[in-house]
Amino acid sequence: MSHQAHAYHMVDPSPWPLTGAGAALLMTSGLAMWFHKNSCILMTLGLILMLLTMYQWWRDIVREGTFLGHHTSPVQQGLRYGMILFIISEVCFFAGFFWAFYHASLAPTPELGLTWPPTGINPLNPFEVPLLNTAVLLASGVSVTWAHHSITEKNRTETTQALTLTVLLGLYFTALQIMEYYETPFTMADGVYGSTFFVATGFHGLHVIIGSLFLLTCLLRHLQYHFTSKHHFGFEAAAWYWHFVDVVWLFLYISIYWWGS
């Protein structure tokens, strides 16, 4: 290998972009097969290949940043910009769902009974499970901030406690959301209310699961001494993502659960 006279990481040849693209092709083709042929085999294969690709690719990134020292300050700065742009793209993603909700709710059409919620829809009580979910996510936001301060102060014990608590709160939120879905008196097929409710809250729930896995990975890396008080961007990215999930939930709660009911 030739001498590298700069601080930027030149990525080694990797098969994971190719396997990731193949997994995406299998999953999208499998989704069409599931819809039209009622067969999940192709989508399951794509999902397995995608999970294996994610594991191997992220393992390589951890190895490069933690053990090989490739994540210099300029590289970390680039990763920060990348994470910020990713979160901005997620904001745009959820903005579409809120647009659909407010487009339907602010000017209900005659098909909806000129009222919101539409005629025949019994919305959930915003002061029961949704309010508990709000408290759970806000508490998890506090605990992940506690974990961040503990890392910067080199307090391993409190970092472990705070990260464990955050992951448990994320799992508790997911369990409450599943229970709520089972108890809803309407379905996704019940017009624009049902579709906007389940798509918006469902994608948020998916992001909570992803964020919980992100933080669980950070906890396992922390237990193996991968983070220092100065070098812990993997955790920072997870914390940013988690705070983003918290903020989205507050907008969902105020818009769909409270105002929309």
From Swiss-Prot:
Class in the EC hierarchy, top level: translocase
Stored Pfam families: COX3 (PF00510)
Localization per Swiss-Prot or TrEMBL: Mitochondrion inner membrane
Any one of the GO CC terms: respiratory chain complex IV
SUPFAM superfamilies referenced in this protein's UniProt entry, alphabetically: Cytochrome c oxidase subunit III-like
Major localization listed first in the record, in broad terms: mitochondrion
Topology Mitochondrial intermembrane: residue spans: 35-40, 106-128, 184-190, 257-261
Transmembrane annotation, as ranges: 16-34, 41-66, 73-105, 129-152, 156-183, 191-223, 233-256
InterPro entries cross-referenced by the UniProt entry: Cyt_c/ubiquinol_Oxase_su3, Cyt_c_oxase_su3_dom, Cyt_c_oxidase-like_su3, Cyt_c_oxidase_su3-like_sf, Cyt_c_oxidase_su3_a-hlx
GO annotation terms (biological process): mitochondrial electron transport, cytochrome c to oxygen
Membrane topology: Multi-pass membrane protein
GO molecular function terms noted in the UniProt entry: cytochrome-c oxidase activity
Mitochondrial matrix topological domain residue ranges: 1-15, 67-72, 153-155, 224-232
Translocase recorded as keyword: yes
Keyword Acetylation attributed: no
Keywords: Membrane, Mitochondrion, Mitochondrion inner membrane, Translocase, Transmembrane, Transmembrane helix
EC number(s) from the headed UniProt entry: 7.1.1.9
Catalytic activity: 4 Fe(II)-[cytochrome c] + O2 + 8 H(+)(in) = 4 Fe(III)-[cytochrome c] + 2 H2O + 4 H(+)(out)
Recorded superkingdom: Eukaryota
Quaternary assembly: Component of the cytochrome c oxidase (complex IV, CIV), a multisubunit enzyme composed of 14 subunits. The complex is composed of a catalytic core of 3 subunits MT-CO1, MT-CO2 and MT-CO3, encoded in the mitochondrial DNA, and 11 supernumerary subunits COX4I, COX5A, COX5B, COX6A, COX6B, COX6C, COX7A, COX7B, COX7C, COX8 and NDUFA4, which are encoded in the nuclear genome.
The family this protein is said to belong to: Belongs to the cytochrome c oxidase subunit 3 family.
The protein's role, per its UniProt record: Component of the cytochrome c oxidase, the last enzyme in the mitochondrial electron transport chain which drives oxidative phosphorylation. The respiratory chain contains 3 multisubunit complexes succinate dehydrogenase (complex II, CII), ubiquinol-cytochrome c oxidoreductase (cytochrome b-c1 complex, complex III, CIII) and cytochrome c oxidase (complex IV, CIV), that cooperate to transfer electrons derived from NADH and succinate to molecular oxygen, creating an electrochemical gradient over the inner membrane that drives transmembrane transport and the ATP synthase.
Protein name, UniProt field: Cytochrome c oxidase subunit 3
Species annotation: Petromyzon marinus
Lineage: Eukaryota, Metazoa, Chordata, Craniata, Vertebrata
